């Protein structure tokens, strides 16, 4: 038996200026390659009010540059706001020098005679610097109440800000960035069956506990009633060579989906790389060090699924007995024999009325015993 010549296929890295789509094909994907949503929400009533009602999530999801700008402005704003209040207290009590206080006058706040001095006293009190040059006296009970109110309110504000910063830093999203999916999916024979395969790797030494990979096939679907579902979701199951539901992701693993008669992919044009569907992959697991749930996502368009290829082995053994995962080979594939037992299907797109007419004519031809093939142009 003649062996199949192996030809290495180097993957192309996706960028915004060079997407992984063929020229002339409109880029349409629900999920980007790095797992971000590609959906734009429009015409949401009271959207800003809804975001303000959930301030915690809003601040955590906020980008760092806006978060730092907002919180810096918040601190400076509270210093200035309470500085103005302290200045008004000094005006009401007659502490300003231009008001001509008597020689034995005891001010509410010593050495606060201007708005600048009031601002500095507010800053020193809120940050607990306490230089000692400006201090509150026992003359004004209102000033004592104001100082307590400022410290309580600003302490709550600092707790909220510190909490959002820590929550944003500790999010498992950053851990998810060290989980890598292969740029392409491949279709080849595995254990005598045609399989769609993807490769996943953990680039940290700390493990993910209870890993599970699930898939969602997104495509336009027409019901028997003629209703068009724009993004119909169908589950696509993946497994490793073992029967375990929780693979040991210490080395790069290849996950398989058997494309048989029960597979939702059996009628898709996988060989041609054409069609109107998207395969979304989701890996879920628990971070070993923090026990937080981590989820990694990616998606594959038809042109990102390679027919008749398999992944190049990326695991080797060193002279010292250590296993080596070579990530320079992670995205490389090798040409193999085309998988057998899988028909090259085509998916029809176009006007639903034309598709209905095609189907009815085809059924009629089958009843009449005719081998006539019917196809209506979408022009």
Swiss-Prot record:
Annotated ATP binding sites: 210-217
Catalytic reaction annotation: K(+)(in) = K(+)(out)
Residue intervals annotated with topology Extracellular: 89-114, 132-140
Intramembrane segment spans (from-to): 115-131
Cytoplasmic-facing ranges: 1-61, 167-379
GO CC term (a single one): plasma membrane
Tissue localization of expression: Widely expressed in adult brain, including in the neocortex, the stratum pyrimadale of the hippocampus and the piriform cortex. Expressed by cultured astrocytes and also by cocultured cortical neurons (at protein level). In the distal segment of the nephron, expressed in the distal convoluted tubule, the connecting tubule, and the early cortical collecting duct.
Residues binding 1,2-dioctanoyl-sn-glycero-3-phospho-(1D-myo-inositol-4,5-bisphosphate): 36, 168, 171, 173
Motif (Selectivity filter): 128-133
UniProt keyword annotations, A-Z: ATP-binding, Cell membrane, Disulfide bond, Ion channel, Ion transport, Membrane, Nucleotide-binding, Potassium, Potassium transport, Transmembrane, Transmembrane helix, Transport, Voltage-gated channel
GO molecular function annotation: ATP binding; inward rectifier potassium channel activity; potassium channel activity
Regulation acting on activity, per entry: Channel activity is strongly regulated by variations of cytosolic pH; channels are activated by alkaline and inhibited by acidic pH values. Activated by phosphatidylinositol 4,5 biphosphate (PtdIns(4,5)P2). Inhibited by Ba(2+) and Cs(+).
Cellular location(s): Membrane; Basolateral cell membrane
Site (Role in the control of polyamine-mediated channel gating and in the blocking by intracellular magnesium): 158
Annotated transmembrane regions: 62-88, 141-166
Membrane topology classification: Multi-pass membrane protein
Subunit note: Homotetramer. In kidney cells, it forms heteromeric channels with Kir5.1/KCNJ16; this interaction is required for KCNJ16 localization to the basolateral membrane. Interacts with MAGI1, alone and possibly as a heteromer with KCNJ16; this interaction may facilitate KCNJ10/KCNJ16 potassium channel expression at the basolateral membrane in kidney cells. Interacts with PATJ.
Function of the protein: May be responsible for potassium buffering action of glial cells in the brain. Inward rectifier potassium channels are characterized by a greater tendency to allow potassium to flow into the cell rather than out of it. Their voltage dependence is regulated by the concentration of extracellular potassium; as external potassium is raised, the voltage range of the channel opening shifts to more positive voltages. The inward rectification is mainly due to the blockage of outward current by internal magnesium. Can be blocked by extracellular barium and cesium.
PANTHER family for this protein: ATP-SENSITIVE INWARD RECTIFIER POTASSIUM CHANNEL 10, INWARD RECTIFIER POTASSIUM CHANNEL
Family classification: Belongs to the inward rectifier-type potassium channel (TC 1.A.2.1) family. KCNJ10 subfamily.
Protein name as it appears in the record: ATP-sensitive inward rectifier potassium channel 10
Upper lineage: Eukaryota, Metazoa, Chordata, Craniata, Vertebrata
């Amino acid at each position: 038996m003649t062996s199949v010549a192996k030809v290495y296929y180097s993957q192309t890295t996706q960028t915004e200026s060079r997407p992984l789509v063929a020229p002339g094909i409109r880029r349409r994907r629900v999920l980007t390659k790095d797992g971000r949503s590609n959906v734009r929400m429009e015409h949401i009533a009271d959207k800003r009010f809804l975001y303000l009602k959930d301030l915690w999530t809003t601040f955590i999801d906020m980008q760092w540059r806006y978060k730092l700008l907002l919180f810096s402005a918040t601190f400076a704003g509270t210093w200035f706001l309470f500085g103005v209040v302290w200045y008004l207290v000094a005006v009401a009590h007659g502490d300003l020098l231009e008001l001509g206080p008597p020689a034995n006058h005891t001010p509410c706040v010593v050495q606060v005679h201007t708005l600048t001095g009031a601002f500095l006293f507010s800053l020193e009190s809120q940050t607990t610097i306490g230089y000692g040059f400006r201090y509150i006296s026992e003359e004004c009970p209102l000033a004592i109440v104001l100082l307590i109110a400022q410290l309580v309110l600003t302490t709550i504000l600092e707790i909220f800000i510190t909490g959002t910063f820590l929550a944003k830093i500790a999010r498992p999203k950053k851990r998810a960035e060290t989980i890598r999916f292969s740029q392409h999916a491949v279709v080849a024979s595995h254990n005598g069956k045609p399989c769609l395969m993807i490769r996943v790797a953990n680039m940290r030494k700390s493990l993910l506990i209870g890993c599970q990979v699930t898939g969602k096939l997104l495509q336009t679907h027409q019901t028997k009633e003629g209703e068009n579902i724009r993004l119909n979701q169908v589950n696509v199951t993946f497994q490793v060579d073992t029967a375990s539901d929780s693979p040991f992701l210490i080395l790069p693993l290849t996950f398989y989906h058997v494309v048989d008669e029960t597979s939702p992919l059996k009628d898709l044009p996988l060989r041609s790389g054409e069609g109107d569907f998207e395969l979304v992959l989701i890996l879920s697991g628990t971070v070993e060090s923090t026990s937080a749930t981590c989820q990694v996502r990616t998606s594959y368009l038809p042109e990102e699924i390679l027919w008749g290829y398999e992944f190049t082995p990326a695991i080797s053994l060193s002279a010292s007995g250590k296993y080596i995962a070579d990530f320079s080979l992670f995205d490389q594939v090798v040409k193999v024999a085309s998988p057998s037992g899988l028909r090259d299907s085509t998916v029809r797109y176009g006007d639903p009325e034309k598709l209905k007419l095609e189907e009815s004519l085809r059924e009629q031809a089958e009843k009449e015993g005719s081998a006539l093939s019917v196809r209506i142009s979408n022009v």
